[in-house]
Design a protein with these regions (language model features):
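Short, structured segments at the rim of ligand-binding sites
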Residues: 1-412
Length: 412
């Protein structure tokens, strides 16, 4: 399938953003560990969350999580402490995404996990049973989902969990989100040092829980505002929380540098806000930023900057190599189609010094990566008739994206 997109001349729209995928997935695992029958309210209906919902209900031995990386990591830990034997598998791409660090850590804690194929990669055969827990060290520069997976089962371990993170800690806001949610459900879990987290052996308590909207999803609307030629453009986003624990709420700061002003309208404490985005003049010639804490925003900001003719040097991108695709190479390849030549430095850095090439009319390839489609679609404001391959991939995190774009006046 190919969508051909064109952007509107004027934007004045109100969008109900999807529930947070990150919060939904954590809440489901915690509620299951609490043996609660309560389903979190305002739960995400994206593919990744649906996979976890089905996995927690299934009686089948084989659990296919498809392309859901979060589900693979969280369920590997969850199934390790639940009685029963399961095979956890996924797509061909999922079988290429390393999971050895998490498996080694779970085995160290006493888990019974075997590789069904290549060592260090899914599928996994897991025989669940009670684990002793205790002290463990793992690198801090691995996917934060490995760390969150271990933390989530910490209260279920006989000795609790003391987790020391060596090396630089990446995506720390996601770790903090996990700890905050664990405490919301009665766990005793916190940092005891700059590199050490302690989780007590105290069971979760099931409770009613509301899922706020997704700050990562808001980033595509910030991009739309930044790329719109309409100086009077207005976008209102419903469901976001001011002071959110979502690490990607930093998007409001990043885009303030790119000329987008964020205003909150709060009706009552603890109630989701209406966030209004306005444009002001951006005079920034170059942007430098470290995405270590918010790598999922990188594609959005990269695509925005080149289309605003803002040079950049971005760091903290190492985890982009092992996402749904190699996002660094995918960005370089697809932006070249639009006439921009990017350079990568090692596995961690991406820069654009203003170099251009002859653009082509080739459709944008999405590489089975939802964030490629999500980040490139707003370019239709600058390039009418932009074509995007396999647009259905957005269902992984933002199922109503195309409908919401049409609400805002895009044609497809």
């Amino acid at each position: 399938m190919i969508y051909t997109l064109s952007g509107p001349q004027h934007i004045d729209t109100t969008i109900q953003l999807p529930p947070s995928k990150s919060i939904s997935n954590r809440a489901l695992i915690i509620q299951a560990l609490a043996n609660g029958n309560l389903v979190p309210r305002h739960l995400s209906d994206c593919d990744d969350t649906k996979v976890i919902v089905e996995a927690l209900k299934t009686r089948s031995e084989t659990i296919d999580i498809k392309a859901a990386g979060t589900a693979m990591r969280f369920l590997a830990a969850y199934l390790s402490v639940r009685e029963g034997e399961h095979v956890l598998t996924g797509t061909d791409r999922m079988k290429q995404r390393p999971i050895g660090v998490l498996v080694d850590a779970l085995r160290y804690l006493g888990a019974d996990i075997q590789y069904e194929g290549e060592v260090g990669y899914p599928p996994l055969r897991i025989k669940g049973h009670p684990l002793a827990g205790g002290f463990i060290e793992i690198p801090g520069n691995v996917s934060s989902q490995f760390i969150s997976a271990l933390l989530l089962i910490g209260p279920m371990l006989e000795k609790g969990l003391e987790l020391k993170l060596t090396d630089e800690i990446i995506s720390r806001p996601y770790i903090d989100l996990t700890l905050c949610m664990m405490r919301d459900f009665g766990a005793i879990a916190d940092w005891t040092d700059v590199d050490t987290i302690r989780v007590a052996a105290k069971a979760y308590s099931a409770r009613d829980y509301y899922i706020e909207s997704d700050w990562t999803a808001s980033s595509y609307w910030y991009e739309i505002m930044a790329l719109a030629d309409d100086s009077e453009a207005v976008v209102r986003l419903e469901g976001l929380m001011d002071g959110s624990k979502q690490g990607d709420s930093v998007v409001k700061y990043i885009f303030s540098l790119l000329g987008i002003k964020t205003s909150f309208k709060t009706t009552a404490p603890g109630v989701p806000n209406i966030v209004t985005l306005h444009r002001h003049k951006c005079l920034l010639p170059r942007l430098e930023y470290d995405f270590t804490g918010s790598p999922d925003l990188a594609q959005t900001v990269v695509v925005t900057c080149v289309n605003m003719n803002i040079k950049f040097h971005f760091k903290g991108l190492s985890t982009l190599r092992i996402k749904e695709t190699d996002r660094i190479e995918a960005l370089k390849t697809e932006l070249r189609k639009l006439g921009f030549v990017l350079q990568s430095v090692g596995d961690d850095e991406l820069l654009w010094d203003g170099e251009r090439c002859q653009p082509s009319d080739e459709p944008i390839k999405t590489y089975e990566d939802h964030r490629m489609a999500l980040a490139f679609a707003p370019v239709a404001l600058k390039r009418q008739g932009l074509q995007i391959n396999n647009p259905e991939v957005v269902s992984k995190s933002y199922p109503d994206y195309w409908k919401d774009l049409q609400t805002a006046g895009f044609t497809l």
